[in-house]
Amino acid sequence: MKRPDCIQHWRDVEGADTPGYPGSEEHFSIGAPLARTLGLRRIGIHHERLPPGRRTSYPHAESDEEEFIYVLEGYPEVWINGYLWKLEPGDSVGFPAGTGVCHTFINNTQEEVRLLVAGESNKKHNRIYYPLNPDYAATRQDRWVDHPPQFFGPHNGKPGRK
């Protein structure tokens, strides 16, 4: 008997490993859009594989959507406003909406990292702040320009120890 559509394995819904942003050849994490596949519309849940030497996204913050990340496997680092923080399996990280705190997850190890990423989905008035990618941000209609002031540390938000 075929399983019902409300049961899915992340491997069966994982997307292609393609560059993540228009105009960039950089590859980011490889995501499986679980919530969308399961028909959930109000929350977003993704399984993310983060190969060595990659990050999940450009550093960003969101105005109206909260984000939650749980480390399933591996030892990533979370970049928060220019500082790296080491994580391990079982660690959770939360980003309340509207704070302007910018983040991305980076895999500076030789082993793959797996993350469970959850958040609110498709809020009409959500805006996104990309502090280190102003050219890309300028192309977006959902650019967040009136975010709270942020102060950034020395790390450039990219894989490696810079």
Label the model's feature ranges.
Residues 47-51, 61-80, 118-120:
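Short, conserved beta-strand element in jelly-roll/cupin
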Residues 40-45, 63-66, 71-73, 88, ...:
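Short connector loops at helix/strand junctions that flank enzyme active sites
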Residues 82-98:
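Short acidic-glycine-tyrosine-enriched beta hairpin
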Residues 28-33, 46-62, 100:
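Conserved short histidine dyad/triad with adjacent acidic residue
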Residues 41, 79-83:
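Short strand-coil-strand connectors
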Residues 39, 97-125:
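Ligand-binding loop in jelly-roll beta-barrel domains
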Residues 1-42, 128-162:
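A short, N-terminal "cap"/entry segment at the start of jelly-roll beta-barrel domains
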